[in-house]
Amino acid sequence: MTQDELYMKEAIKEAKKAEEKGEVPIGAVLVINGEIIARAHNLRETEQRSIAHAEMLVIDEACKALGTWRLEGATLYVTLEPCPMCAGAVVLSRVEKVVFGAFDPKGGCSGTLMNLLQEERFNHQAEVVSGVLEEECGGMLSAFFRELRKKKKAARKNLSE
């Protein structure tokens, strides 16, 4: 198992915590010098805050833990490709590297729809490693949304009876 896979497994553990709460199963860990500085998972539904994405929360926790907004030398591991908001937070917090699992065809801004993390017009760019444990990360999301659709369909059926 590679170092990236090891830390992605930790992000997957966080994603499972989100799923247990009925949240979209996305998890993240932030690592500096081989040490996990912060862990987080999606809490958007729980907190009813649009910015409570795993990446935003893990960056916030890391900044608090380190006492600085500059996360130079940090690697962010996240189970789903960052969205525009999260990619912006990565750039603004100076995260050095982003490693993600599943690609996001609807909102991915680390190479799928666009690549904000390596946009040369910004004063900071992050290295990007994509597709680490992609099947496991993507499988969790697919299963979650499949189950959610099933529940919604059953609820509609019950209403029509």
Curated annotation (Swiss-Prot):
Q: Which GO terms describe its molecular function?
A: tRNA-specific adenosine-34 deaminase activity; zinc ion binding
Q: What class of enzyme is it?
A: hydrolase
**The record's free-text note on cofactor binding:** Binds 1 zinc ion per subunit.
Catalytic center at which residues? E55 (proton donor)
Task: Give the keywords, sorted.
Answer: Hydrolase, Metal-binding, tRNA processing, Zinc
Where do the coiled-coil regions begin and end? none
Please tell me whether the keyword tRNA processing is annotated for this protein: yes
This entry's Enzyme Commission designation comes to 3.5.4.33
Q: List positions binding Zn(2+).
A: H53, C83, C86
Cystine pairs: none
Listed NCBIfam families: PRK10860.1 (NF008113)
The UniProt entry's sequence similarity note says:
Belongs to the cytidine and deoxycytidylate deaminase family.
Protein name stated in the entry: tRNA-specific adenosine deaminase
Upper classification of the source organism reads: Bacteria, Bacillati, Bacillota, Bacilli, Bacillales
